[in-house]
Amino acid sequence: MGSFDKAKWVWHNSYRGKNVYVNFEDKFTLKSAPSSCKVKISCDRSYALYVNGEFAHCAQCSDYEDLKFYDEVDITGHIKPGENELFVTVYYQGVSCSTYRCGEPGLIFEVIADGGVVCASSERTVAYKNSAYESGEGVEWVTVQLGIGFHYDATREGEREGEKYADIVEKTYDIRPRPVKLLKIEPPKSAGLINKGVFFDLADGTPAQKMQAAALAVQYVCGSLPLPSEEGIKLSVEGSYKGHEPDGVFAIADLGEESTGLLLLDLEVPHECDVYVGWGEHLADLRVRAHVGGRNFAVKYRARAGRNAFFAPFLRLGLRYLELHVYARECTLYYTGVRPTVYPLPEPAEPPITDGLHKKIYEVACRTLQLCMHEHYEDCPWREQALYTMDSRNQMLCGYYAFGETRFPRASLELIAHSLREDSLLELCSPAEVAITIPSFSAMFLVQLWEYLDF
């Protein structure tokens, strides 16, 4: 049986603009629990998959409209006898950047249990807008490389705006298996709260601009307070302030090392309020540098009264530090951090050195390389996460030695090759549409190919 023999590309045609999130629901019934159950899934730009209310996976291998890939996700552990529910949220950015080449919106999936298709996307799949995510032009870009950030309103969860059966849309059915391994989405990374206090807004603008300009009044923290915390860490306005009252409480968490992952929040507030979350790699400003020359390394979360647990599956962060600005006079923080996203690799080769310092440099270099490997090589884990020929050439050379595998570099080379333009130059990044290109980077691609064959 071929891939997607019974499935159709679906969408909700009322939501075809920029920066939209659409939910899809389907059901299937099994007499008994299968020994194996998998989902084959593809979309434009990324998806989050849930089975029977449990998170199963999120991703989308970087591809092109005429070179589509699908993921195969094992959901056996989520399946039960009787009726099973499949829930998918798809994020469609609808505008190209350095890490995404815009295609037509669409989702396709098949559920295969013990070798047979038991559920497939079709005109009977239910579709509706995910209203918790703000859609449209009002959400700021993180960077021109990464694309658009997000504003999420937890008070709007459960809305089913525009609910109807899905529309069938035209996209290619020549969909290939993901050329690289699925990422491991790990449990929450341990962190430590290293600073807290109150903040005073001094500027308007995006969440990142407001965080960067805010005045901070620090409260004493003894060392680092571990996160996650079962009992929670109390944040509150203490004492009185002359003049302007604080706008809320803040906290800074340290993940202990450079990391890549998906944002996870767990906090409790007495009333609805905004929570700004900024991230960065250093604290040179005595805070996270959330706003850098028009770039916005912060997102907005609207918390409902009470306990809030939030997982953000569509934007991978590169960071060491997280900063929260909570627009309330008190808050209990149980966790802020990430679920690391890790590309599975063998243990690095042992270097022929015995000196401790040089061995440490080698270990850090191997970890840095892995932090720049997800769907393809990335020039950096934080600001761009983009595939360039010149950058990836050096990464490939290091990877051949350190990890001894060629599957990942081959996939990146194929993505680059598919970006060939009408003027016989390559796009600056792949897959992407960028206003400029660098001719010498196109020339370097030939060197990469030769080195791939040589190694």
Question: Where do the protein language model's features map onto the residues?
Answer:
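Well-ordered alpha-helical scaffold segments within catalytic/enzyme domains
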Residues: 394-405, 445-455
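The substrate-binding groove and active-site-proximal loops of carbohydrate-active enzymes
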Residues: 432-437, 453-455
